[in-house]
Amino acid sequence: MSFSSDTKDELARIYPEEEESKIAELAALIRTIGSISMYGNGKISLTFTTENASVARLVFKLIKDLFGIIPETMVRRGRYLKKTLSYLIFVPDTKIAEEILGKVKILNYEKGHIKLNYGIDQKILKNSKAKKAYLRGAFLGGGSISDPEKAYHMEFITHNLEHGKDLSKLINSFDLNSKVIARKNNYVVYLKEGEQIVDVLNIIGAHSALLNLENIRVYKEMRNNVNRIVNCETANLTKTINASLRQIESINYIKETVGLDYLPPNLKEVAELRINYPDLSLKELGQMLVPPVGKSGVNHRLRKIEEISKKLKERRVQ
Protein backbone atom coordinates (compact mmCIF):
# COMPACT_ATOMS: atom_id res chain seq x y z
CA MET A 1 0.00 0.00 0.00
CA SER A 2 1.06 3.59 -0.61
CA PHE A 3 1.87 6.15 2.08
CA SER A 4 -1.34 7.97 1.11
CA SER A 5 -3.50 4.83 1.45
CA ASP A 6 -1.96 3.99 4.81
CA THR A 7 -2.71 7.51 6.02
CA LYS A 8 -6.35 7.24 4.92
CA ASP A 9 -6.77 3.88 6.61
CA GLU A 10 -5.43 5.40 9.83
CA LEU A 11 -7.77 8.40 9.58
CA ALA A 12 -10.83 6.32 8.72
CA ARG A 13 -10.46 4.53 12.07
CA ILE A 14 -10.90 7.83 13.92
CA TYR A 15 -14.58 8.27 14.75
CA PRO A 16 -15.71 11.68 16.03
CA GLU A 17 -17.53 11.75 19.36
CA GLU A 18 -19.39 15.06 19.16
CA GLU A 19 -22.33 15.50 16.81
CA GLU A 20 -20.86 18.77 15.47
CA SER A 21 -17.70 16.92 14.41
CA LYS A 22 -19.70 14.10 12.79
CA ILE A 23 -21.71 16.63 10.77
CA ALA A 24 -18.56 18.52 9.71
CA GLU A 25 -16.76 15.35 8.60
CA LEU A 26 -19.80 14.10 6.69
CA ALA A 27 -20.14 17.51 5.00
CA ALA A 28 -16.55 17.28 3.74
CA LEU A 29 -17.11 13.72 2.48
CA ILE A 30 -20.20 14.84 0.57
CA ARG A 31 -18.17 17.66 -1.01
CA THR A 32 -15.42 15.32 -2.15
CA ILE A 33 -16.89 11.88 -2.91
CA GLY A 34 -20.62 12.65 -2.86
CA SER A 35 -22.90 13.37 -5.80
CA ILE A 36 -26.38 14.87 -5.65
CA SER A 37 -28.90 13.78 -8.27
CA MET A 38 -31.94 15.99 -8.88
CA TYR A 39 -34.83 14.65 -10.92
CA GLY A 40 -37.57 16.48 -12.81
CA ASN A 41 -40.28 15.42 -10.39
CA GLY A 42 -38.53 17.17 -7.50
CA LYS A 43 -36.85 14.03 -6.18
CA ILE A 44 -33.30 14.06 -4.86
CA SER A 45 -30.85 11.25 -4.16
CA LEU A 46 -27.38 11.21 -2.64
CA THR A 47 -24.55 8.85 -3.63
CA PHE A 48 -21.03 8.40 -2.23
CA THR A 49 -18.40 6.63 -4.36
CA THR A 50 -14.98 5.60 -3.06
CA GLU A 51 -12.32 2.96 -3.74
CA ASN A 52 -11.40 2.83 -0.06
CA ALA A 53 -13.42 0.33 1.96
CA SER A 54 -12.52 2.05 5.25
CA VAL A 55 -13.90 5.36 3.99
CA ALA A 56 -17.09 3.63 2.80
CA ARG A 57 -17.59 2.12 6.27
CA LEU A 58 -17.08 5.53 7.85
CA VAL A 59 -19.71 7.17 5.60
CA PHE A 60 -22.16 4.35 6.35
CA LYS A 61 -21.67 4.72 10.12
CA LEU A 62 -21.94 8.52 10.09
CA ILE A 63 -25.25 8.43 8.19
CA LYS A 64 -26.58 5.64 10.40
CA ASP A 65 -25.65 7.41 13.66
CA LEU A 66 -26.71 10.92 12.65
CA PHE A 67 -29.96 10.11 10.85
CA GLY A 68 -30.96 6.68 12.12
CA ILE A 69 -31.17 5.08 8.68
CA ILE A 70 -29.36 2.24 6.93
CA PRO A 71 -28.18 3.52 3.53
CA GLU A 72 -28.00 1.17 0.57
CA THR A 73 -24.57 -0.19 -0.31
CA MET A 74 -23.08 -1.64 -3.46
CA VAL A 75 -19.67 -2.92 -4.55
CA ARG A 76 -18.71 -2.50 -8.19
CA ARG A 77 -15.64 -3.82 -10.02
CA GLY A 78 -14.00 -1.58 -12.61
CA ARG A 79 -14.04 -2.51 -16.26
CA TYR A 80 -11.22 -3.03 -18.73
CA LEU A 81 -7.71 -2.59 -17.30
CA LYS A 82 -8.80 -0.96 -14.05
CA LYS A 83 -10.17 -3.85 -12.00
CA THR A 84 -10.28 -1.99 -8.67
CA LEU A 85 -13.38 -2.16 -6.51
CA SER A 86 -15.63 0.85 -5.99
CA TYR A 87 -17.88 1.13 -2.94
CA LEU A 88 -21.18 2.97 -3.31
CA ILE A 89 -23.26 4.32 -0.42
CA PHE A 90 -26.69 5.31 -1.74
CA VAL A 91 -29.50 7.36 -0.16
CA PRO A 92 -32.40 7.15 -2.65
CA ASP A 93 -35.13 8.59 -0.43
CA THR A 94 -35.72 12.29 -1.22
CA LYS A 95 -36.82 13.22 2.29
CA ILE A 96 -33.76 11.65 3.93
CA ALA A 97 -31.38 13.02 1.27
CA GLU A 98 -32.82 16.51 1.85
CA GLU A 99 -32.47 16.09 5.60
CA ILE A 100 -28.81 15.08 5.27
CA LEU A 101 -27.98 17.89 2.83
CA GLY A 102 -29.81 20.41 4.98
CA LYS A 103 -28.03 19.29 8.13
CA VAL A 104 -24.59 19.75 6.55
CA LYS A 105 -25.67 23.16 5.12
CA ILE A 106 -25.23 22.18 1.49
CA LEU A 107 -28.90 22.43 0.55
CA ASN A 108 -31.11 25.41 1.38
CA TYR A 109 -34.65 26.36 0.41
CA GLU A 110 -35.26 29.97 -0.57
CA LYS A 111 -38.80 31.02 -1.55
CA GLY A 112 -39.69 27.46 -2.43
CA HIS A 113 -36.59 26.94 -4.59
CA ILE A 114 -33.67 24.66 -3.86
CA LYS A 115 -30.34 26.45 -3.50
CA LEU A 116 -26.99 24.68 -3.31
CA ASN A 117 -24.28 26.16 -1.13
CA TYR A 118 -20.94 25.51 -2.84
CA GLY A 119 -18.75 26.96 -0.10
CA ILE A 120 -18.25 25.80 3.49
CA ASP A 121 -21.01 27.14 5.72
CA GLN A 122 -19.36 28.49 8.87
CA LYS A 123 -22.29 27.21 10.94
CA ILE A 124 -20.96 23.65 10.69
CA LEU A 125 -17.50 24.73 11.88
CA LYS A 126 -18.67 25.46 15.40
CA ASN A 127 -15.41 24.70 17.19
CA SER A 128 -11.83 23.52 16.72
CA LYS A 129 -12.81 19.84 16.77
CA ALA A 130 -15.39 20.39 14.02
CA LYS A 131 -12.82 22.23 11.88
CA LYS A 132 -10.33 19.38 12.28
CA ALA A 133 -13.06 16.84 11.48
CA TYR A 134 -13.91 18.73 8.28
CA LEU A 135 -10.27 18.67 7.17
CA ARG A 136 -10.07 14.96 7.99
CA GLY A 137 -13.15 14.27 5.87
CA ALA A 138 -11.79 16.40 3.03
CA PHE A 139 -8.56 14.39 3.04
CA LEU A 140 -10.35 11.04 3.24
CA GLY A 141 -12.55 11.99 0.31
CA GLY A 142 -10.26 13.98 -1.97
CA GLY A 143 -6.83 14.08 -0.41
CA SER A 144 -3.51 12.47 -1.19
CA ILE A 145 0.06 12.70 0.03
CA SER A 146 3.21 11.84 -1.92
CA ASP A 147 5.71 9.26 -0.76
CA PRO A 148 7.97 11.43 1.45
CA GLU A 149 10.99 9.44 0.26
CA LYS A 150 10.51 11.10 -3.14
CA ALA A 151 8.84 14.48 -2.51
CA TYR A 152 6.82 16.55 -0.05
CA HIS A 153 3.40 17.20 -1.53
CA MET A 154 -0.07 17.07 0.01
CA GLU A 155 -3.27 17.97 -1.82
CA PHE A 156 -7.04 18.07 -1.53
CA ILE A 157 -9.07 17.78 -4.74
CA THR A 158 -12.47 19.43 -5.00
CA HIS A 159 -14.88 20.02 -7.88
CA ASN A 160 -15.76 23.62 -7.06
CA LEU A 161 -13.59 26.74 -6.86
CA GLU A 162 -15.64 28.30 -4.07
CA HIS A 163 -15.21 25.18 -1.96
CA GLY A 164 -11.50 25.08 -2.83
CA LYS A 165 -11.01 28.65 -1.63
CA ASP A 166 -12.95 28.01 1.58
CA LEU A 167 -11.00 24.80 2.21
CA SER A 168 -7.69 26.61 1.70
CA LYS A 169 -8.86 29.35 4.07
CA LEU A 170 -9.78 26.72 6.68
CA ILE A 171 -6.35 25.07 6.38
CA ASN A 172 -4.62 28.45 6.61
CA SER A 173 -6.57 29.31 9.78
CA PHE A 174 -4.13 26.90 11.48
CA ASP A 175 -1.18 29.18 10.50
CA LEU A 176 -0.43 27.21 7.34
CA ASN A 177 0.09 28.35 3.76
CA SER A 178 -1.97 26.25 1.34
CA LYS A 179 -2.68 27.41 -2.21
CA VAL A 180 -5.36 26.67 -4.82
CA ILE A 181 -4.78 25.83 -8.48
CA ALA A 182 -7.01 24.59 -11.31
CA ARG A 183 -6.29 21.12 -12.71
CA LYS A 184 -8.41 19.96 -15.62
CA ASN A 185 -12.01 20.08 -14.37
CA ASN A 186 -11.07 20.19 -10.69
CA TYR A 187 -9.44 22.51 -8.17
CA VAL A 188 -6.51 21.46 -6.03
CA VAL A 189 -5.63 22.82 -2.59
CA TYR A 190 -2.00 21.91 -1.94
CA LEU A 191 0.96 22.22 0.43
CA LYS A 192 4.56 21.45 -0.53
CA GLU A 193 6.64 22.07 2.61
CA GLY A 194 7.48 19.09 4.80
CA GLU A 195 6.87 20.96 8.08
CA GLN A 196 3.44 22.18 6.96
CA ILE A 197 2.41 18.68 5.84
CA VAL A 198 3.46 17.38 9.28
CA ASP A 199 1.27 20.07 10.86
CA VAL A 200 -1.76 19.03 8.77
CA LEU A 201 -1.26 15.36 9.67
CA ASN A 202 -1.18 16.37 13.32
CA ILE A 203 -4.33 18.49 12.97
CA ILE A 204 -6.36 15.72 11.34
CA GLY A 205 -5.07 13.05 13.73
CA ALA A 206 -2.80 10.96 11.48
CA HIS A 207 -0.16 10.49 14.17
CA SER A 208 1.37 7.26 12.83
CA ALA A 209 1.75 8.80 9.37
CA LEU A 210 3.23 11.89 11.02
CA LEU A 211 5.88 9.84 12.86
CA ASN A 212 6.76 7.92 9.68
CA LEU A 213 7.13 11.15 7.73
CA GLU A 214 9.24 12.74 10.47
CA ASN A 215 11.54 9.69 10.55
CA ILE A 216 11.98 9.91 6.79
CA ARG A 217 12.62 13.67 7.01
CA VAL A 218 15.31 13.17 9.67
CA TYR A 219 16.95 10.38 7.65
CA LYS A 220 16.93 12.46 4.45
CA GLU A 221 18.38 15.47 6.27
CA MET A 222 21.17 13.35 7.77
CA ARG A 223 21.89 11.80 4.38
CA ASN A 224 22.02 15.24 2.74
CA ASN A 225 24.33 16.54 5.47
CA VAL A 226 26.68 13.57 5.00
CA ASN A 227 26.68 14.13 1.24
CA ARG A 228 27.47 17.83 1.73
CA ILE A 229 30.35 16.98 4.08
CA VAL A 230 31.74 14.36 1.68
CA ASN A 231 31.43 16.74 -1.27
CA CYS A 232 33.13 19.51 0.70
CA GLU A 233 35.97 17.22 1.80
CA THR A 234 36.36 15.89 -1.74
CA ALA A 235 36.53 19.44 -3.10
CA ASN A 236 39.12 20.42 -0.49
CA LEU A 237 41.18 17.30 -1.19
CA THR A 238 41.10 17.98 -4.93
CA LYS A 239 42.16 21.57 -4.29
CA THR A 240 45.04 20.41 -2.05
CA ILE A 241 46.25 17.82 -4.59
CA ASN A 242 46.14 20.33 -7.45
CA ALA A 243 48.07 22.88 -5.39
CA SER A 244 50.69 20.26 -4.44
CA LEU A 245 51.17 19.21 -8.08
CA ARG A 246 51.50 22.84 -9.15
CA GLN A 247 54.07 23.51 -6.42
CA ILE A 248 56.13 20.42 -7.30
CA GLU A 249 56.08 21.40 -10.97
CA SER A 250 57.41 24.87 -10.09
CA ILE A 251 60.13 23.43 -7.82
CA ASN A 252 61.25 20.91 -10.47
CA TYR A 253 61.44 23.67 -13.08
CA ILE A 254 63.71 25.73 -10.81
CA LYS A 255 65.80 22.63 -10.03
CA GLU A 256 66.27 21.77 -13.72
CA THR A 257 67.06 25.30 -14.90
CA VAL A 258 69.06 27.11 -12.21
CA GLY A 259 69.17 24.59 -9.35
CA LEU A 260 67.60 24.80 -5.91
CA ASP A 261 70.62 26.69 -4.54
CA TYR A 262 69.24 29.64 -6.50
CA LEU A 263 66.55 29.89 -3.82
CA PRO A 264 67.02 31.62 -0.45
CA PRO A 265 67.68 29.09 2.37
CA ASN A 266 64.17 29.36 3.84
CA LEU A 267 62.55 28.68 0.44
CA LYS A 268 65.02 25.93 -0.46
CA GLU A 269 64.18 24.09 2.78
CA VAL A 270 60.45 24.12 1.98
CA ALA A 271 61.07 23.16 -1.66
CA GLU A 272 63.08 20.06 -0.69
CA LEU A 273 60.42 18.96 1.81
CA ARG A 274 57.63 19.42 -0.74
CA ILE A 275 59.46 17.25 -3.32
CA ASN A 276 60.28 14.55 -0.78
CA TYR A 277 56.84 14.55 0.85
CA PRO A 278 54.28 15.42 -1.87
CA ASP A 279 51.31 14.03 0.09
CA LEU A 280 51.81 16.07 3.26
CA SER A 281 49.53 18.98 4.11
CA LEU A 282 50.89 22.50 4.61
CA LYS A 283 50.50 22.09 8.36
CA GLU A 284 52.52 18.85 8.34
CA LEU A 285 55.25 20.40 6.19
CA GLY A 286 55.49 23.33 8.59
CA GLN A 287 55.99 21.02 11.56
CA MET A 288 59.02 19.44 9.83
CA LEU A 289 60.80 22.77 9.39
CA VAL A 290 63.44 23.97 11.87
CA PRO A 291 62.14 25.97 13.58
CA PRO A 292 58.51 24.91 12.87
CA VAL A 293 56.40 27.26 10.75
CA GLY A 294 52.62 27.64 10.67
CA LYS A 295 50.37 26.70 7.77
CA SER A 296 50.11 30.27 6.47
CA GLY A 297 53.90 30.68 6.62
CA VAL A 298 54.46 27.51 4.54
CA ASN A 299 51.82 28.64 2.06
CA HIS A 300 53.53 32.04 1.74
CA ARG A 301 56.91 30.41 1.00
CA LEU A 302 55.46 28.05 -1.61
CA ARG A 303 53.77 30.98 -3.35
CA LYS A 304 57.11 32.78 -3.47
CA ILE A 305 58.63 29.67 -5.09
CA GLU A 306 55.82 29.62 -7.70
CA GLU A 307 56.45 33.32 -8.44
CA ILE A 308 60.18 32.66 -8.94
CA SER A 309 59.39 29.75 -11.28
CA LYS A 310 57.01 31.96 -13.25
CA LYS A 311 59.63 34.71 -13.66
CA LEU A 312 62.24 32.19 -14.82
CA LYS A 313 59.82 30.91 -17.47
CA GLU A 314 59.09 34.45 -18.64
CA ARG A 315 62.83 35.21 -18.99
CA ARG A 316 63.32 32.05 -20.99
CA VAL A 317 60.55 33.02 -23.41
CA GLN A 318 62.12 36.45 -23.92
UniProtKB/Swiss-Prot annotation:
DNA-binding region(s) from the entry: 281-314
A Pfam family recorded for this sequence: LAGLIDADG_WhiA
Any GO BP: regulation of sporulation
Keywords, comma-separated and alphabetical: Cell cycle, Cell division, DNA-binding
Segments traversing the membrane: none
Signal sequence, renumbered to the chain: none
InterPro entries reported in the protein's UniProt record: Homing_endonucl (IPR027434), Sporu_reg_WhiA_N_dom (IPR018478), Sporulation_regulator_WhiA (IPR003802), Sporulation_regulator_WhiA_C (IPR023054), WhiA_LAGLIDADG_dom (IPR039518)
GO molecular function: DNA binding
UniProt keyword Cell cycle present: yes
Source superkingdom: Bacteria
Stated role: Involved in cell division and chromosome segregation.
Family membership noted in the UniProt record: Belongs to the WhiA family.
Protein's name according to its UniProt entry: Probable cell division protein WhiA
Lineage of the species this protein comes from: Bacteria, Bacillati, Bacillota, Clostridia, Thermoanaerobacterales
Gene transcribed to yield this protein: whiA
